[in-house]
Amino acid sequence: MTAPKCVTTTTYLVKTKEQPWWPDNAIRRWWISVAIVIFIGVCLVALMYFTQQQARNGSGSG
C-alpha cells in the first residue's frame, strides 16, 4: 500500500532539510510573511462573518 502524497512530500522535505533547498533566506522570509498575512486575513474574514451571523440571529425579525 503506497503512502499518501502529502506524507511522501513531508518525508522528502525532512530528508532534504540538511541541504539548502531554499534558494535564499529572503525568499523564505517573504513566503513566511505572505503566509502570516493570508492567515490573519482569513481570521479577520471569519470573525466578521461570525459577528454578522450573531447579530442577525440576535436581532431576530428586526
UniProtKB/Swiss-Prot annotation:
A Gene Ontology cellular-component term: host cell membrane
Localization recorded for this chain is: Host membrane
How is this protein positioned relative to the membrane? Single-pass membrane protein
Report which residue ranges the record marks as coiled coil. Answer: none
Where does the chain cross the membrane? 30-50
The main location class comes to host cell
- Alphabetized UniProt keyword annotations: Host membrane, Membrane, Transmembrane, Transmembrane helix
Protein name (Swiss-Prot/TrEMBL):
Protein UL148D
Tell me what gene encodes this: UL148D
